[in-house]
Amino acid sequence: MTTIRQQRSSLLKGWPQFCEWVTSTDNRIYVGWFGVLMIPCLLAAAICFVVAFIAAPPVDIDGIREPVAGSFLYGNNIISGAVVPSSNAIGLHFYPIWEAATLDEWLYNGGPYQLVIFHFLIGICGWMGRQWELSYRLGMRPWICVAYSAPVSAAFAVFLVYPFGQGSFSDGMPLGISGTFNFMFVFQAEHNILMHPFHMAGVAGMFGGSLFSAMHGSLVTSSLIRETTETESQNYGYKFGQEEETYNIVAAHGYFGRLIFQYASFNNSRSLHFFLAIFPVVCVWLTSMGICTMAFNLNGFNFNQSVVDANGKVVPTWGDVLNRANLGMEVMHERNAHNFPLDLAAAESTSVALVAPSIG
């Protein structure tokens, strides 16, 4: 009895020390309670991804006994390689290793894909929670994890919500470069994402955010307060932790206000940086919402045959060109699983004028 009590007391003493180490902000890398969840999940996802990318056997992604190879050992390279999504025969079923009769069956049906994405999604949620936790411990505001929620929402949209809406994890995004582009083409063909307002907002956020970032960085760099001689780098004029401003915001404000107009320039550094953070974040949120709506087939606008003349004859537009391109991509997608999409059998084909008429 004495020995057992001593062992339990030593364990109880070790637990508070472990808790203190986990939540300590003095560590070189903060762990946190969310990190306790994040680290093993991301490690499991990364290890399985690397092994599957190198050596996974072909996967019967369409469920028609025609496996698709995605690993290095089966002839792929860094561009064409991917972790192929789980089989359409599995659908939305949870498919851990113990659900398969053999390991070969699990690999053939694309089990590694589910293992990677589930651990990855839990891991990035843990990373987001860890960002909030560290901000809380340091007395900071929580906006860092709010900004990070944008890519988290995008990952959940393509890896979880979209397969749920389409009815199978085989419709999820493959984990590879060519697989990602294939996913984008198929998404355009089936949902016309280019004509969805939320996708347009996402494009505006990405390009606009890049533009604003470049503008802000160049303005700050151009209005630095010189603390060095002409022969030294201006970077040496900054000391980490200094209280003085490192650039002249009045000069930057005046330059940009005269370049465009006065009210296009921020005169408040805090509101400026909040805008730089929130603009791309909100736009990526909207894009994720668009993916989630299209997952349930609430698709982008279709302007096919939308313009007619006084006689009721269709006037071909670029909307018809886009629709024809979508049909072409849809025909090529899963061409062995079905002969052609029903869209092609719905109506007679209409010619699209892409060449100028001959004159004379």
From Swiss-Prot:
The record marks 162 as: Tyrosine radical intermediate. One of its GO terms (biological process) is response to herbicide. The chain crosses the membrane at residues 30-47, 119-134, 143-157, 198-219, 275-289. Pheophytin a binds at residue 127. The D1/D2 heterodimer binds P680, chlorophylls that are the primary electron donor of PSII, and subsequent electron acceptors. It shares a non-heme iron and each subunit binds pheophytin, quinone, additional chlorophylls, carotenoids and lipids. D1 provides most of the ligands for the Mn4-Ca-O5 cluster of the oxygen-evolving complex (OEC). There is also a Cl(-1) ion associated with D1 and D2, which is required for oxygen evolution. The PSII complex binds additional chlorophylls, carotenoids and specific lipids. One of its GO terms (cellular component) is plasma membrane-derived thylakoid membrane. Chlorophyll a PD1 binds at residue 199. It is found in: Cellular thylakoid membrane. Its EC number is 1.10.3.9. The keyword Lyase does not apply. It is a multi-pass membrane protein. Tyr-162 forms a radical intermediate that is referred to as redox-active TyrZ, YZ or Y-Z. C-terminally processed by CtpA; processing is essential to allow assembly of the oxygen-evolving complex and thus photosynthetic growth. [CaMn4O5] cluster binds at residues 171, 190, 333-334, 343, 345. The record marks 191 as: Stabilizes free radical intermediate. A quinone binds at residues 216, 265-266. Fe cation binds at residues 216, 273. Keywords: Calcium, Chlorophyll, Chromophore, Electron transport, Herbicide resistance, Iron, Magnesium, Manganese, Membrane, Metal-binding, Oxidoreductase, Photosynthesis, Photosystem II, Thylakoid, Transmembrane, Transmembrane helix, Transport. Residues 346-360 form a propeptide. Chlorophyll a ChlzD1 binds at residue 119. Photosystem II (PSII) is a light-driven water:plastoquinone oxidoreductase that uses light energy to abstract electrons from H(2)O, generating O(2) and a proton gradient subsequently used for ATP formation. It consists of a core antenna complex that captures photons, and an electron transfer chain that converts photonic excitation into a charge separation. The D1/D2 (PsbA/PsbD) reaction center heterodimer binds P680, the primary electron donor of PSII as well as several subsequent electron acceptors. PANTHER family: PHOTOSYSTEM II D2 PROTEIN, PHOTOSYSTEM II PROTEIN D1. PSII is composed of 1 copy each of membrane proteins PsbA, PsbB, PsbC, PsbD, PsbE, PsbF, PsbH, PsbI, PsbJ, PsbK, PsbL, PsbM, PsbT, PsbX, PsbY, Psb30/Ycf12, peripheral proteins PsbO, CyanoQ (PsbQ), PsbU, PsbV and a large number of cofactors. It forms dimeric complexes. Belongs to the reaction center PufL/M/PsbA/D family. This is Photosystem II protein D1. The gene is psbA.
